[in-house]
Regions:
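Charged (often Lys/Glu-rich) extended helix/loop segments that serve as interaction or gating elements
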Residues: 1-85
Length: 85
């Protein structure tokens, strides 16, 4: 199957690959983005109220969760609604 691999944000630049040949996928399956480099944590964003994704470090056959997926509560933890609203 030939497909564009896109992210969850409604922006024209939110894509990981265009016209990429992929195996047949079913709804709910995941795609791993390997060799993403060291920019995941430093360049991640909460833009559009999106919690930060989990990160997994992979080396050879070993892997480790290095950052848990952020929850909605994590996302709004530092916010406060003023009393006058």
């Amino acid at each position: 199957m030939l497909a564009d691999v896109v992210g969850p944000i409604c922006e024209s630049g939110d894509f990981l690959a265009r016209n990429r040949k992929l195996p047949s996928l079913r709804q709910g399956e995941f795609i791993a983005v390997m060799s993403a480099g060291a920019y995941g944590f430093s360049m991640s964003s909460r833009y559009n109220s999106r919690p930060l994704a989990a990160e997994v470090m992979v080396k050879g056959g070993e892997f480790e969760l290095v950052r848990k997926r952020e929850t909605y509560h994590d996302l709004i933890r530092g916010e406060k609604v003023p009393d006058f609203i």
